[in-house]
């Protein structure tokens, strides 16, 4: 149990070392990031999304950008720190799910480290994008599918699976495609 704590701390340190160049080097502000900041800024000024602001950002993403602008104004550092927090939650949860399913003979942090590397490769997953926020809830849905595959008769888990995919769709609309993934997983692996 003590070893698991050290592995978790080392996983967090590993991820922060991966993100340190971005946080310290002052990454340039890219057009999608600026667009998200402007959506939050306009919503903070009282404009309504889809009525006054014509953008393709999903409703919960717009709400998140509005809250960040409300508390921190147009700060790229706030967006990067929020992205790091969301990414850390994802990494730790993914590692937890993999370790509780005993995919490896011993508990280790290799799945979380690989997930951290993959998060750092893509721009959409290294900033506070709608895709990153939706991915959090898709990971929660993945955890529910794993539980459903173990305990085949639990209707509350099926509801939570759909709820998480629905919330992910409210952050990033193309995430609704994963509803098909959830249905197929339930159909093929549980016989439901």
What is the predicted function of each stretch?
Residues 76, 112-132, 144, 170:
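Aromatic- and kink-enriched transmembrane "portal" helix at the membrane-lumen/periplasm boundary
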Residues 139-157:
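Membrane-interface transmembrane helices that cradle and orient dolichyl/undecaprenyl
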Residues 2-33:
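Transmembrane signal-anchor helices characteristic of membrane glycosylation enzymes that use polyprenol
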Residues 94, 98-118, 135-136:
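Transmembrane-helix signature of polytopic, membrane-embedded enzymes
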Residues 81-101:
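Transmembrane-helix motifs of polytopic, lipid-linked glycan transferases
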Residues 178-192:
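Perimembrane helix-loop-helix junctions
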Residues 156-173, 179-181:
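Membrane-interface alpha helices of multi-pass inner-membrane proteins
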Residues 35-41, 52-77:
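Short hydrophobic/aromatic helix or loop-helix immediately within or flanking a transmembrane segment
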């Amino acid at each position: 149990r003590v070893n698991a704590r050290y592995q978790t701390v080392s996983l967090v340190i590993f991820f922060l070392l991966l993100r340190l160049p971005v946080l310290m080097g002052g990454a340039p502000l890219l057009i999608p990031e600026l667009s998200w900041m402007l959506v939050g800024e306009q919503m903070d000024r009282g404009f309504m999304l889809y009525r006054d602001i014509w953008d393709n950002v999903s409703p919960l993403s717009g709400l998140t950008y509005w809250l960040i602008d409300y508390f921190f104004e147009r700060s790229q550092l706030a967006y990067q720190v929020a992205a790091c927090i969301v990414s850390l939650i994802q990494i730790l949860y993914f590692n937890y799910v993999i370790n509780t399913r005993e995919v490896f003979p011993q508990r280790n942090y290799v799945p979380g480290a690989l997930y951290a590397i993959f998060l750092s490769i893509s721009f959409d997953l290294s900033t506070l994008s709608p895709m990153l926020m939706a991915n959090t809830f898709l990971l929660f849905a993945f955890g529910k599918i794993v539980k459903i595959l173990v305990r085949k008769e639990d209707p509350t888990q099926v509801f939570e699976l759909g709820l998480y995919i629905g919330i992910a769709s409210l952050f990033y609309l193309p995430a609704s495609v994963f509803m098909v993934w959830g249905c197929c997983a339930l159909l093929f692996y549980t016989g439901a």
